[in-house]
Amino acid sequence: MQIPKYENKPFKPPRRVGSNKYTQLKPTATAVTTAPISKAKVTANLKRSISAGPTLNLAKKPNNLTSNENTRYFTIMYRKPTTKKHKTWSGDGYATLKANSDKLCFYNEAGKFLGSSMLPSDSDSLFETLFKAGSNEVQLDYELKENAEIRSAKEALSQNMGNPSPPTTSTTETVPSTKNDGGKYQMPLSQLFSLNTVKRFKSVTKQTNEHMTTVPKTSQNSKAKKYYPVFDVNKIDNPIVMNKNAAAEVDVIVDPLLGKFLRPHQREGVKFMYDCLMGLARPTIENPDIDCTTKSLVLENDSDISGCLLADDMGLGKTLMSITLIWTLIRQTPFASKVSCSQSGIPLTGLCKKILVVCPVTLIGNWKREFGKWLNLSRIGVLTLSSRNSPDMDKMAVRNFLKVQRTYQVLIIGYEKLLSVSEELEKNKHLIDMLVCDEGHRLKNGASKILNTLKSLDIRRKLLLTGTPIQNDLNEFFTIIDFINPGILGSFASFKRRFIIPITRARDTANRYNEELLKKGEERSKEMIEITKRFILRRTNAILEKYLPPKTDIILFCKPYSQQILAFKDILQGARLDFGQLTFSSSLGLITLLKKVCNSPGLVGSDPYYKSHIKDTQSQDSYSRSLNSGKLKVLMTLLEGIRKGTKEKVVVVSNYTQTLDIIENLMNMAGMSHCRLDGSIPAKQRDSIVTSFNRNPAIFGFLLSAKSGGVGLNLVGASRLILFDNDWNPSVDLQAMSRIHRDGQKKPCFIYRLVTTGCIDEKILQRQLMKNSLSQKFLGDSEMRNKESSNDDLFNKEDLKDLFSVHTDTKSNTHDLICSCDGLGEEIEYPETNQQQNTVELRKRSTTTWTSALDLQKKMNEAATNDDAKKSQYIRQCLVHYKHIDPARQDELFDEVITDSFTELKDSITFAFVKPGEICLREQ
């Protein structure tokens, strides 16, 4: 670096600001005349004195902007001085430079004067110089050249020029006369530099609105600033414009970066969620088939709503819709006057600054990847807490997230980790603008610490995502709804009195023919639907059929081995069941044991119920040596056929880790490469296991625990899935089966469900097909289709007795219930039944005051027949479009893997229901 050489120069007197050269004024020694002088004479003499003497460049007040064509205009950026490494500008404005002047005057975008600064000596560095103006640092952006830009700048600067400043000096006052030897006037030095400013009178009392002068509203609004949306709707193809209320100042338009990827149902979902979080009432849509997402409707406010429950089926893109909503609220707001805006009136910040996303720990990595996929992490700051962090490091990271504004906007955290940092979140809860809860059905327990922690944060805008919000418990339903929109259903006591009691009574099998109770229950159900549909959105995955590859569903009924039949008989005899006292809760242990027998008799010996109630050592030894079963035989044949006949991967799902152990051993013996995910896998390893399976072509199989690992996973690397056993809750199986048929899948999918013929496996399948009625009614899948199925999720004594029955003389008990066809692969069309009318007639006849024993027995028989008919009808409705195939008569199962392996499986498969995909149908 070159250091300038020191030179001892003589002192240079300072010059006045605004003067191009140094001027020294000396007072004269002439005697002052005391006689008064006329004003005109003083003025004339003063002009002569100034013109004859040295030139004085008297600075004018910068705000006095006259229409001077030689004035140059610039745009500027300004900020307060800061020592930050990454500096940002806090505002925009203008600068003016008058002709023959070396001073820049700076103003903010509203025309307020910020300060002035001298031009740099080097004119080439004009736009690189950092000027000091008052308490701000200022830098020139560019010079305005276009007439329209200059006119706009003049208008902005003239807003603060309504009241011109008073003159700095008075030329009309009588001044004493001073003469020098040359007969010329000179002003005294003290008077020349004194500023006689006129101060406005300041009232002693504080002014209130009552003392203010009333200005007409029209004149106030005439100069009101205009605001514009972040995106120009005219430059976007098929834009998504959000609805608004009457107070909105600007439209909110979804960023086309995301909007162009959204499907029609996702566009509707984003608008629905936005309306709910903004507290807008639902619009009245006459024709739901018309796309209303391109128009902004002015809606009334709904003060009861500030949250939303998105209950779409798995695979409909709930994560993408949520990211779109988050990005929209971070960048935009309808109330532009409440945030900082650019000089052109575009909001610079959005409605939300900090957003908290809470999800299962297995989905944290997936959420961050989705943000990176759709937005790029350079656009939005996403913070996740590392699993290697200590508790203190986590707390510090959360504190920094909330207090540092511009680094991170989104915090993704697991439900369990939420408890450890709850104190930091609660201290700064006013900084959190929005809460997103993925897999929100985990909050259904009112006593949950996680739920109470989230409630204590008191975040107004809440979004819950779930594919299974409710099955059959209205208490859990109330807990979730009251968390989303507190108080909308009233207190729990009033909710129980008004809704739970009448609906539960109507669903009780003992009241199935009580017309009054059923009518009241139906009325309360409809009332609840009207309340909750304002903020609950539920769509099924049927709308994905036109976007995803075809999917073929195959239900295979597997013949049980003789050892399995023997195990069923021994267990049922040893249990000594008393069906008169038996309930579903008391028989859960026995049900689980029988399900294990369906998977493999070798699981019996380690079962707790078997050890405590049966303890047959001789039978146990014979079972433990028999690891095979009908389903295991079919499974291994399918796996071998998939490996040899295709280049596809496969996912095997079970509800029991012990069953996965057996399958894993068999796959190891067969030399099938695989990976596994269950409850024993640490959370930090799960994401890497899924990624490895999807990307590594050498991995053939994926063993998945339905309950421990089936939440939110994306396994599109596989195109075939085998559900080895069933769960009582149909949503568990549906969620597990949806792991492969979702966005990102490129191949046709095949879903296999294995069921042991005539055993408890098949009874569970039948219950699954009949269930979901309560969920469908309250979430809007179908309001009337399942109107009569309000009690189909309850067990009576006959149901339990049938549950423990083993049918060895049937090819499919399910097919026997619904159809009498020959199983030749035809799709059966069922005639409409008059079931509802028969049910109503039975109800009316059961309300008579007296009946004889003979009539009572007749009615009981009719009721039993009616129940069987109803059960058949519900199962039949769920199996619409399925082909009925008896392998003894038809060897085409619409799948090349099963067809090629049919010689091995012919004795192991007793029946099949097949719902072919589009490709299979075209090939036929």
Swiss-Prot record:
The UniProt annotation places ATP binding at 346-353
Stated name of the protein: DNA repair and recombination protein RDH54
Q: What is its main location?
A: nucleus
Q: Which transformation does this protein catalyse, written as a reaction?
A: ATP + H2O = ADP + phosphate + H(+)
As for family, the record states: Belongs to the SNF2/RAD54 helicase family.
Q: Where is the composition biased (Low complexity)?
A: 168-178
Q: Where does the protein end up?
A: Nucleus
Q: Where is the Helicase ATP-binding domain?
A: 299-487
Q: Which UniProt keywords apply?
A: ATP-binding, DNA damage, DNA recombination, DNA repair, DNA-binding, Helicase, Hydrolase, Isomerase, Isopeptide bond, Meiosis, Nucleotide-binding, Nucleus, Topoisomerase, Ubl conjugation
GO CC, one annotated term: nucleus
Protein purpose: Involved in the recombinational repair of double-strand breaks (DSB) in DNA during mitosis and meiosis. Has DNA dependent ATPase activity. Promotes D-loop (displacement loop) formation with RAD51 recombinase. Modifies the topology of double-stranded DNA during the D-loop reaction to facilitate the invasion of the homologous duplex molecule by the initiating single-stranded DNA substrate. Required for adaptation from G2/M checkpoint arrest induced by a double strand break, by participating in monitoring the extent of single-stranded DNA produced by resection of DNA ends.
| BP GO annotations | double-strand break repair via homologous recombination; reciprocal meiotic recombination
Where would I find the Helicase C-terminal domain in this sequence?
A: 631-790
* Native organism: Saccharomyces cerevisiae (strain JAY291)
Q: Where is this motif: DEGH box?
A: 472-475
The EC code for this enzyme is 5.99.1.-, 3.6.4.12
Q: Where is the composition biased (Basic and acidic residues)?
A: 1-10
Q: Where is this region: Disordered?
A: 1-21, 155-183
